[in-house]
Regions:
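A local structural micro-motif
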Residues: 30, 47-48
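Short, cationic-aromatic polyanion-contact patches
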Residues: 1, 17, 48-66
Length: 66
């Protein structure tokens, strides 16, 4: 699963939201939270927070490091 996420983010240099990653991989987004956290600790990916005030949403954009 980590390799699939890495390949997916390589094709999206501006990053993707958690739900977008889940849609591409066809998995439930809650199952990705631990995997993304592990990848962040390993230094493979990083996330930046984003606010959408118009829709009242707060989310993280995940992207490859380096």
């Amino acid at each position: 699963m980590k390799e699939q996420i890495r390949e997916l983010l390589a094709h999206h240099p501006n990053g993707l939201r958690l739900r977008e990653i889940a849609i591409y991989l066809r998995v439930h987004h809650f199952s990705l939270i631990n995997i993304l956290d592990e990848m962040k600790k390993e230094g493979i990916i990083d996330g930046r927070s984003n606010d959408d005030h118009a829709n009242g949403e707060y989310y993280i954009i995940w992207y490859l490091v380096g």
